[in-house]
Amino acid sequence: MASMWAPEHSAEAHSNLSSTTDDCGSVSVAFPITMMVTGFVGNALAMLLVSRSYRRRESKRKKSFLLCIGWLALTDLVGQLLTSPVVILVYLSQRRWEQLDPSGRLCTFFGLTMTVFGLSSLLVASAMAVERALAIRAPHWYASHMKTRATPVLLGVWLSVLAFALLPVLGVGRYSVQWPGTWCFISTGPAGNETDPAREPGSVAFASAFACLGLLALVVTFACNLATIKALVSRCRAKAAVSQSSAQWGRITTETAIQLMGIMCVLSVCWSPLLIMMLKMIFNQMSVEQCKTQMGKEKECNSFLIAVRLASLNQILDPWVYLLLRKILLRKFCQIRDHTNYASSSTSLPCPGSSALMWSDQLER
């Protein structure tokens, strides 16, 4: 998703901009710039760490997991680079979108890009959660049956989402300029006199499909992560009863459970408001486009804008919850442990070269 930190007073909402509004607009442009730079740095760091770890790994399963994380970071990074500059350009121009894009092709490209990179990120995260749950809950079945390489699966997900996002180009669904006029996305309903009644059923179906697919991906991710946490706790208790390294297993389980809960919190906070609000607007036969022509829609329009802002944060937070924070916190923990000599070498958690895959080495035993 793009960095949609739009100002509350846009050129489209107010055609007669005063100097004060211009000043506000120039200040507001700092938001999308900050979002783009922050997302670029985080995802670039994640890709660098994944690349270094990938070259050191010999296990195909671990390489597949690293490839999924790298693909997710690349997806978020490319999505930002394709959309954020357009938003910044609209901010700085202080002109209506229709003046910058009279043909509507840029709007279609923008909406398609947001759909592809937003939905593909959700589906890739869901696929990673499924693989993680199978590897932990049924390791022997997973090792003997899961022979598919990660690359074809990731390409299949991306191409499927691309085919879905191209439906509005074929006449099923519609991408339109969204309030306050600085971005384009899926139309959820009628837009006053501008809407073609013949295309409205297709728009509703397409928007509903996007929201339902996104919510389904969230549900699958939540269910698989909870199943993984439950399996980790059960295995930790079993290991503690027969092994002397119960402290090590406790640390591994706690750290992994915290990371998985962090992933669930980030996904729910970032995506649930937008997807649920889209379904609500479809049910109420409302579209954000109506904010340009109808009074009394300020509350709904502001709520939808906040929901899109939250969704845009997912691109920035993804590399941190999946990789960067785990590596940083683990190193900090090891530094504290080494400083206090808390654990002996026989039960200490391995620190050199630790990464998001550290726990998988232990769980295979």
UniProtKB/Swiss-Prot annotation:
Taxonomy of the source species: Eukaryota, Metazoa, Chordata, Craniata, Vertebrata
Q: How is it modified after translation?
A: Ligand binding is affected by cAMP-dependent phosphorylation in brain membranes.
Q: Name one Pfam family in it.
A: 7tm_1
Amino acid composition bias (Polar residues), ranges on this chain? 13-22
- Return the SUPFAM superfamilies for the record: Family A G protein-coupled receptor-like (SSF81321)
An example Gene Ontology molecular-function term: prostaglandin E receptor activity
Q: Name which cysteines form disulfide bonds.
A: C107-C184
Specify the protein name. Prostaglandin E2 receptor EP3 subtype
Topology within the bilayer: Multi-pass membrane protein
Q: State what the entry records as the consequence of deleting this gene.
A: No visible phenotype. Mice are born at the expected Mendelian rate. Females have normal fertility. Mutant mice have normal renal function, urine volume and urine osmolality. Mutant mice fail to develop fever in response to pyrinogens, including IL1B, prostaglandin E2 and bacterial lipopolysaccharide (LPS). Mutant mice lack the normal potentiation of platelet aggregation by prostaglandin E2 and display prolonged bleeding times and decreased susceptibility to thromboembolism.
- List UniProt keywords, sorted A-Z: Cell membrane, Disulfide bond, G-protein coupled receptor, Glycoprotein, Lipoprotein, Membrane, Palmitate, Phosphoprotein, Receptor, Transducer, Transmembrane, Transmembrane helix
Record's signal peptide: none
Q: How does it assemble?
A: Interacts (via C-terminus) with MKLN1.
What are the record's GO terms for cellular component? plasma membrane
User: Which species is this UniProt entry from?
Assistant: Mus musculus
Glycoprotein: is it a keyword of this entry?
A: yes
